[in-house]
Amino acid sequence: MAVTKLVLVRHGESQWNNENRFTGWYDVDLSEKGVGEAKAAGKLLKEEGYSFDFAYTSVLKRAIHTLWNVLDELDQAWLPVEKSWKLNERHYGALQGLNKAETAEKYGDEQVKQWRRGFAVTPPELTKDDERYPGHDPRYAQLTEKELPLTESLALTIDRVIPYWNETILPRMKSGERIIIAAHGNSLRALVKYLDNMSEEEILELNIPTGVPLVYEFDENFKPIKHYYLGNADEIAAKAAAVANQGKAK
């Protein structure tokens, strides 16, 4: 049976992951640790014999720079890359820039968990005169006002990620190209929910660690057979638990 592999990588730790802030579409860069995570992911993929024909990422530099570091370690810096806002992190609305633990102290752990992980729950909206509104950013100049989010739930994130997967990424895989996607916690959770047909309750508990390659294997009909992380299982579990704990009051 012919097996097709897809590699997903959540960006390495960002400066705002390190400061425990809601980031969303804010274009913060990788921390020093995050650069190291991205390089380590590339080294691991090289050791395991991976190489790629095409890459996808978002229009946010923490994902772009993660991909650059991964491809650099693979000696594939030349690889063609498509950047799309449809792979951006979920938009966190008026929470963007706020400290997660301080927000939990103010509103309670459960409310923040729902904002972070509730399937159809949207954080408080931005207003269009807010400097954080994406309509002020030239990289989104081609988007319609309807496409520009004031806030997003995971459900709304799925509404942009999955059509992009089906219409753009999957056809490349079906043509035989080996694909890597460097994206974000919630855009990847959106894709994982779809691929694994997870329930809303199951996706609530899923935490994707930063900078760890996640491999999906597909059968000849492009149905997922299995998935697994590359690397030390205990370290990966600890990183996933740390992601889950970010939204709790200290």
Swiss-Prot record:
Metabolic or biological pathway: Carbohydrate degradation; glycolysis; pyruvate from D-glyceraldehyde 3-phosphate: step 3/5
Name of the top EC class for this enzyme: isomerase
Enzyme active site: H11 (tele-phosphohistidine intermediate), E89 (proton donor/acceptor)
One family name in Pfam for this protein: His_Phos_1
Keyword Nucleotidyltransferase tagged: no
Catalytic activity: (2R)-2-phosphoglycerate = (2R)-3-phosphoglycerate
Subunit note: Homodimer.
Function: Catalyzes the interconversion of 2-phosphoglycerate and 3-phosphoglycerate.
Protein name: 2,3-bisphosphoglycerate-dependent phosphoglycerate mutase
Natural source organism: Citrobacter koseri (strain ATCC BAA-895 / CDC 4225-83 / SGSC4696)
Organism ancestry: Bacteria, Pseudomonadati, Pseudomonadota, Gammaproteobacteria, Enterobacterales
Gene that encodes the chain: gpmA
